[in-house]
Every structure is written in C-alpha cells, then in structure tokens.
Amino acid sequence: VISLRRLFALATAAAAASLAPALALADPAPAAGTLLTDPGLTPQLKILALLTLLSLLPAVVLTMTSFTRVVVVLGFVRHGIGTQQSPPTQVIVGLALFLSAFTMAPVTTAIARDAWEPYSAGRITAEQAVAAATTPLRSFMLRQTRESDLALFYEAARQPLPQTEEEVPLRIAAPAFVVSELTTAFQMGVMVLLPFLVIDLVVSALLMSMGMMMVPPSTLSLPIKLLLFVVADGWHLLVGSLLRSFA
C-alpha cells in the first residue's frame, strides 16, 4: 500500500524537476526545494512555495503517471457498453487513480528511499533530492514511450537524440510519454470496442430482418452486452490487461 507521503514525494519531486529548465533560464533565485528549507524565509513564503508545488499535482498525475492510459481505456469500456452514466465518472476516475497508484508503487518506493528519506534526514540537499527522484520517474516514462514519439520532440526542439536515458530531460520525456500513452490507450480501446460493435451490428440486422425498424437497437443490445461482459468477467480481464501493459 502506497502512503500519502510517498505520493506527495512523487508529486513534489516531479513538479520541482519539471520547473528546473524554466528556473535555469530565469534570474538567479532560490530553487523550489531551497524555498522550503531556507531559514531566512518567513513561514508565509514557505507555505506559498509549498502551495505552488501542490498546484502542479494534477498536471503531474496526468502527464507523468499511468493515469492517462487507465482512465482513457475505462472511458472506452463505458462507451462501448452503452451505459452513459454507469459507472459514474467519479468511479472511473477513482478506479484510475488507485490503479495508477498501484502501478507506480515501484517508482514511489524508489523516490521515497533514494530522495525523500535522505532529504528529510538532512543527508542530501534539495537539488540532490530532485535529481535522485527524477531518475526512477524518468526511467518509468521512457519504458512506456515509443522511440518515434521521443524522436518527434527532439526533432521539434532541434536537438540531437540522446545516447542514454539520463540525458533525456523531463520537458521532453513528459510530452512524449503522454503521446505514447494515448496511442496505447486507443489501441486497447479498439480491442475493447470490437466485440460490442459486433453485437450492435447483429442486433440491428436482426431487427431489420424482423421488420422492427422502429425499435432502437440499444434497447436489446445493451442487456446482451452487459450479460456478455459479466459472463466473461470483464472487469477482471480489463484490470488485468491494464496492469500487465505496464510490466
């Protein structure tokens, strides 16, 4: 089970790392981690720096974790079955968050071990903690990123391709990762929608052959699709496929 402290460490590290290029181009100023630990700053400024990092949490969850793939595939399932509001959007998002937390467990564990705990104990600086936290997060994203998507952003940035993954900055790894996640999610969505599409076509053909053209096909196809999904243990197969896709 992933603790809230580990999730907070992941979000803080990713947010600080994503801000690093912009901070480097700006006028010399304390880094995000330094703002939280500088004894010369007032508590109000420290709270402001912390709230700034927390405001980036939704962007971190959407662009640097497995959440995007999971929530898109779950949305395709609901659309394919034809139940517009069941399961509710809140349930889909909640399930996607918990599945994302489960798949990101090795990353958060590595961040807590290599970055958060040493930094909390005062053994490393804030900059060293950000660098240590970035390594497992970047490694996870690059494992799920297609080379063509990564090359696309390097070409757009007019930079040579890196030789090692340590040379890939998060400002390039994150968008390439999101594009790859959307591609994978749509591929899985096609496989999910095909059986439901076949049922819709068969039901429509049967209704037309029986002269019942005024009967909406969804009236008969919805119970059949629900029955098929339940008999096939659809949620078990779906969640298992999603988890294995990140292995």
Locate predicted features:
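N-terminal secretory/membrane targeting signals
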Residues: V1-D27
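Hydrophobic alpha-helical segments and their helix-loop boundaries in membrane
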Residues: R6, L23-A247
